[in-house]
Swiss-Prot record:
The lineage of its organism: Bacteria, Pseudomonadati, Campylobacterota, Epsilonproteobacteria, Campylobacterales. This is Chromosomal replication initiator protein DnaA. Domain I is involved in oligomerization and binding regulators, domain II is flexibile and of varying length in different bacteria, domain III forms the AAA+ region, while domain IV binds dsDNA. Residues 1-74 are annotated as: Domain I, interacts with DnaA modulators. It is found in: Cytoplasm. One of its GO terms (cellular component) is cytoplasm. Belongs to the DnaA family. Residues 317-440 are annotated as: Domain IV, binds dsDNA.
Length: 440
């Protein structure tokens, strides 16, 4: 079967809108494809990632059923601004990976800020000549979901492949499934050969290895063998090694015997830079107003932000509309409403009071001490930004005369933010903490 016919035949399996909106935009890339690797080009990187995630396995299965042959499906951006090196990776290396590395996850496409520069620096440093397995080993990167840990992990993988290294990238789930299936088939030698004989081992979400002692025992021996052979090991997790539940002490000790780097929620300027980078990479034009609205209205999960950008681009393309602030607000309204329903003013009050070492009762009183007034205004400001409470409702909460008192406080704190960079940073930090807590 001609691979270009796969999508046309798959059309019968999908509804018309689904096919027209997504798969009809794919073009078969014969030049980069091989017998067991089929490459398709999508209009941009965001669309490519979406189609790869949602339809990649379905396309592969359909191709196998129709042709009798197995093939890896790789969806990439036609206009991707990446070097040819990332598209010339040897098929043997691709087949050696548990999961294909995303070629767009590079160090160049990673936006560096105060929240991630230590993790970025450690990972980048080991990809210099003769540093793999010798400089920092292992590297353990942790932080909340959606902040770029996988991007950084795969950036190391892509850089290592360009150096001619054998790379294994796997999530904990991949690792567990590989072990289980090989155990059932009596082929553990194959499993050991795959994971132990690599130059670089990348494990995503290592915290999920704590399901069984047998899995951890296997990983312990694999870890030791790779380390003893000067292979590089990098892992990601939601928490530092000492806080991993269900993980044995000897594994925690191994994880901590190197660089431990955290990634925290980005400050507003880094968040805006990330959005600009995503738009630039995918040839999507958004005004400053829209970019600022996305940055201030959503949490810090980069995948969520990408999803919004994909939706905006899809709306504009399908409806033939310009992407305006009004369109952005319309597309995002349900998402923002859902976020706001998870955050209460009591949550905000509690966090601000803890930060300023003030009693909640003082903030809700009419006391005029400067630090209490500032804390009160910050609570009001954050409540307006992060909850659905109206000004009259806030006035009732603080037992103020009417909503004009709330409006006055909002105006004052806004002026203070404009003139005080440290206060602006502090409020942004508090906002990020509240958003992260609401997502946990």
């Amino acid at each position: 079967m001609n691979p270009s016919q796969i999508l046309e035949n798959l059309k019968k399996e999908l509804n018309e809108n689904e096919y027209e909106n997504y798969l009809s935009n794919l073009k078969f890339n014969e030049k980069q494809s091989k017998a067991d690797l089929l490459v398709f080009n999508a209009p941009n990187e965001l669309m490519a990632k979406f189609i790869q995630t949602k339809y990649g396995k379905k396309i592969a299965h359909f191709y196998e059923v129709q042709s009798g042959n197995k093939a890896i499906i790789n969806i990439q951006a036609q206009s991707a601004k990446q070097s040819n090196k990332s598209t010339k990776i040897d098929i043997a290396h691709i087949k050696a990976q548990s999961t294909i590395l995303n070629p767009s996850f590079t160090f160049d496409s990673f936006v560096v800020g105060d929240s991630n520069k230590y993790a970025y620096g450690a990972c980048k440093a080991i990809t210099h000549k003769d540093k793999l397995g010798k400089l920092y080993n292992p590297i353990f990167v942790y932080g909340p979901t959606g902040l770029g840990k996988t991007h950084l992990l795969q950036a190391v993988g892509n850089a290592s492949l360009e150096m001619g290294k054998k790379v294994i990238y796997a999530t904990s789930e991949n690792f567990i499934n590989d072990f289980t299936s090989n155990l059932k088939n009596g082929s553990l030698d194959k499993f050991h050969e795959k994971y132990r004989n690599c130059d670089v081992l990348l494990i995503d979400d290592v915290q999920f290895l704590g399901k069984t002692d047998k899995i951890q025992e296997e990983f312990f021996f694999i870890f030791n063998e790779i380390k003893n052979n000067d292979g590089q090991i990098i892992m990601t997790s939601d928490n530092p090694p000492n806080m991993l539940k269900g993980i044995t002490e000897r594994l925690k000790s191994r994880f901590a015997h190197g660089i431990i780097a955290d990634i925290t929620p980005p400050q507003l300027d880094t968040k805006i830079a990330i959005i600009r980078k995503k738009c630039e990479f995918n040839d999507i034009n958004l005004s400053n107003d829209i970019i600022n609205y996305i940055a201030t209205s959503l949490g810090d999960n980069i995948r969520e932000i990408e999803g919004i950008i994909i939706s905006l681009n899809a709306y504009a393309t399908i409806l033939g509309q310009e992407i305006t602030l009004e369109l952005a607000k319309s597309v995002m309204k349900d998402h923002i409403k859902e976020k706001k329903e998870n955050i209460t003013i009591d949550d905000i009050l509690s966090l601000v009071c803890k930060e300023f070492n003030i009693k909640p009762s003082d903030v809700k009183s009419n006391k005029k001490t400067q630090n209490i007034v500032t804390a009160r205004r910050i609570v009001i400001y954050l409540a307006r930004a992060l909850t659905a409470l109206t000004m009259p409702q806030l006035a009732n909460y603080f037992e103020m005369k009417d909503h004009t008192a709330i409006s006055h406080n909002v105006k004052k704190i806004t002026e203070m933010i404009e003139n005080d960079a440290s206060l602006k940073a502090k409020i942004e930090e508090l906002k990020n903490k509240i958003l992260v807590k609401s997502q946990s």
